[in-house]
Each structure stands twice: as structure tokens, then as C-alpha cells.
Amino acid sequence: MMLRLLSSLLLVAVASGYGPPSSHSSSRVVHGEDAVPYSWPWQVSLQYEKSGSFYHTCGGSLIAPDWVVTAGHCISRDLTYQVVLGEYNLAVKEGPEQVIPINSEELFVHPLWNRSCVACGNDIALIKLSRSAQLGDAVQLASLPPAGDILPNKTPCYITGWGRLYTNGPLPDKLQQARLPVVDYKHCSRWNWWGSTVKKTMVCAGGYIRSGCNGDSGGPLNCPTEDGGWQVHGVTSFVSAFGCNFIWKPTVFTRVSAFIDWIEETIASH
């Protein structure tokens, strides 16, 4: 549902080290593939209530037993939410799922987030769960990078989510993944790429073949560590309004390492 789109200056919010990625190729996330079940065990589905049923709207990452990080544009005070942990196939109850209600007063959007200016940055929010997650094989905590950490150009990261399979396309049932190499700020901020739209508190990844799309918003950009693990370096924020995988418009993420202090302060005070 969410994932900000920007056409040149119009974006669209994509409102989108554990287990090896699957090796087969198909066409998902926008030219991604089905993830190995529960291979990204910090991935969550943020769902909103409508007419008595809940529907997937955004992704998120479990960063503490009772805290999830997602995108600011995923949060509306007018909606009722739940978080589903241990999810893989949205259409089937498979057993590991943990459904946790969210209290509206436990939604913490970054104070500088401006819904009318996605390109201004600060597209990040924290959700305090109404009860702690039960950790296990299918539900684990994400690791976050150190404050200020910047990934080198072409770092091979993975986006994960249940976003549309292509622009205006269908939503998948199974969790999707796609390999998105990091595009550093020097390249991503070129005038014929994202220009001044992209800020240093963001991270770009991917290209015109693989990208995030609507429904991936808030989900993680998972990047490898030297010890064989993974860190969540990005929160999926926006793509071009011309299309989810438009040339010279890589997917843009909120750079998690730019907000470590805010994350730690918010959790400590609540």
C-alpha cells in the first residue's frame, strides 16, 4: 500500500547473516525471487485493519524483542495496526507466525518527518509491540550498523518484502528478495540520477532491473558483514513515480546508521 513515488521530484513511498539467499531466479520484488522461508527472520509484516480484517501495508524489522523499525510514511494515526512476525506466505497460516496488536500511543515517528516532503528525509518510525516477541528459528533480532557507518559503492545488499512484483502489478503471497548493490551518494546524487532529491541520510541501492515497489516500504535493506552475518542498513522509503524500476532511479532507503542515536534514545525513554 505504501512506498513513496517521486517523478524526478516525484517519489513514491514503497509503502517496501541469517540463512543463505535462495539461488533460483524468478520475477519477484521487481525481478527478484522467492526468499528461502524464514531466512530473513527479523522481517515483519505491518498490517492495518479494515472492515474487521487486516491487510499487509508495509514491512519492518524486529530490532529488539518488543521494538520494530519501519518507515515514517507507513504510519497513520487514523489506522489500527498489528505486526506479524515469523511470516512467509501471507495467504497461508504456516505455524511460526506471531500476531501482535499495536497500541496507537506506541507509534513513534521521527519528529522531523514531513509527510508532504518525502525527499526531506527522516522517513523512519519505531513501533513498540504490546508484548515481546518469542525468539526462535523463524523470529530473530536484526543487527544494526554502528552510528555513521557508510557502505562502499556496490556493496551487495538484499531488499526483502511483499511489495508489488512490478509497477502496478500484483502483490505476492510469499516473501520476496532481490540483490541490490549499493549506489554511493556520489553517484546517486548526480543530476541525471536522483540529484538533490537524495540526501546524505539516505542510501541508494539497485538499478533499473531490480528494485523495491509498493508494499516494500519500511522493510529492510540487508547488507553482509565481514563475519558472515547481516545488518539492516536501510529502511525502504521511495522509488520513482515513473516506475518502480526506472533507469537511473535506484530504490532509496532511509540510512539506519544516521538515526542510531534517535533509535536508542526513543527505546530508552519508552
Swiss-Prot record:
Q: GO cellular component terms? A: extracellular space
Catalysed reaction per UniProt? Preferential cleavage: Ala-|-Xaa. Does not hydrolyze elastin
One example of the protein's molecular function in GO is: serine-type endopeptidase activity
User: Pro-peptide positions?
Assistant: 16-28
Say if the entry is tagged with keyword Hydrolase. yes
Which keywords fit this entry according to its UniProt record? Disulfide bond, Glycoprotein, Hydrolase, Protease, Serine protease, Signal, Zymogen
Q: Any S-S bridges, and between which cysteines?
A: 58-74, 117-120, 157-223, 188-204, 213-244
Q: List this protein's GO terms for biological process.
A: proteolysis
Organism domain of life? Eukaryota
Q: What is its EC number?
A: 3.4.21.70
Please give the CDD domains that the UniProt record associates with this protein. Answer: Tryp_SPc
Signal sequence bounds: 1-15
Q: Could you tell me which InterPro entries the record lists for this protein?
A: Peptidase_S1_Elastase_sf, Peptidase_S1_PA, Peptidase_S1_PA_chymotrypsin, Peptidase_S1A, Trypsin_dom, TRYPSIN_HIS, TRYPSIN_SER
Q: Which residues are glycosylated?
A: 114
* Domain Peptidase S1 span(s) in chain numbering: 29-268
Q: Which residues form the active site?
A: 73 (charge relay system), 123 (charge relay system), 217 (charge relay system)
The family database entries (SUPFAM superfamilies) matched by this protein are listed as: Trypsin-like serine proteases
Q: What role does it play?
A: Efficient protease with alanine specificity but only little elastolytic activity.
- Family from the record: Belongs to the peptidase S1 family. Elastase subfamily.
Q: What is this protein called?
A: Chymotrypsin-like elastase family member 3A
Q: Which gene encodes it?
A: CELA3A
